[in-house]
Amino acid sequence: MDSPRNVTEFFMLGLSQNPQVQRMLFGLFLLVFLVSVGGNMLIIITITFSPTLGSPMYFFLSYLSFIDTCYSSCMTPKLIADSLHEGRAISFEGCLAQFFVAHLLGGTEIILLTVMAYDRYVAICKPLHYTTTMTRHVCIVLVAVAWLGGILHSTAQLFLVLQLPFCGPNVINHFVCDLYPLLELACTDTYVIGLLVVANSGVICLLNFLMLAASYIVILRTLRSHSAEGRRKALSTCGAHFTVVALFFVPCIFIYMRPSSTLSIDKIVAVFYCILTPMFNPLIYTLRNAEVKNAMKNLWRK
């Protein structure tokens, strides 16, 4: 049951109150948004229409690009609009919707990145069983599991917020609706809920990151017996994936693996994984992957 509340809308402080800085942020975030959406859509189109990119790795990469496109579209347009004027109001329902979608996509991406590491583990450590293990049916099931995990995670987070009474103030010291800034506005003791947030968000991030790290340790040990060319190709693919993992996981662990309090650096960290990481992902995968670059060139010639 929802807790009683007097608050019908929130006001976001954003990243800066300086009009000149706001104009600079508008141009910067508009450029980042266009590059992010354009780059990720280009990867989706390239994988969809390129017969040479039919392996499970690219199947998962297309879904990662789709999630990053949605993630950027969930966060950045509101931030761009808020940079143009001082009124940064968002309805209570709109705040919860943004919060739910962000955690849905974030939770799904965390699990999908772990699935992609498992795909690389099977391809490198058990190559003879790769085609029989990573069938199209298995890939679809793994993507479905990632989405289901994201739904369960975001639903649990939303349930925690709905238990909070909001009686005022209603000014969020952030540029997005997230748990810790909302916990600060609740007119009740939030210690227990803060621990549940750490258990739900922080532990999930940490456990998945540890599984990813363990899989790459096994992969690196296996690569010692491969040829120099085989090591180079595998390290190129795995290096791109691990870079994406580090860019997404490290900020998330920093934010959620600590008590429910906000730090001055939290906004900068949030900009990194909410706004910049979805832009970096397509750049990392295309610049370090010859197959993707060649497929893009072939599509361009057509």
Curated annotation (Swiss-Prot):
Pfam families from the UniProt entry: 7tm_4
Compartment annotation: Cell membrane
InterPro entries documented for this protein: GPCR_Rhodpsn, GPCR_Rhodpsn_7TM, Olfact_rcpt, Olfactory_Receptors
Cytoplasmic side: 46, 117-139, 213-236, 288-302
PROSITE patterns: G_PROTEIN_RECEP_F1_1, G_PROTEIN_RECEP_F1_2
GO cellular component: membrane; plasma membrane
Molecular function per GO: G protein-coupled receptor activity; olfactory receptor activity
Annotated transmembrane regions: 25-45, 47-67, 96-116, 140-160, 192-212, 237-257, 267-287
Family: Belongs to the G-protein coupled receptor 1 family.
Role summary: Odorant receptor.
Annotated protein name in UniProt: Olfactory receptor 4C3D
Gene name per UniProt: Or4c3d
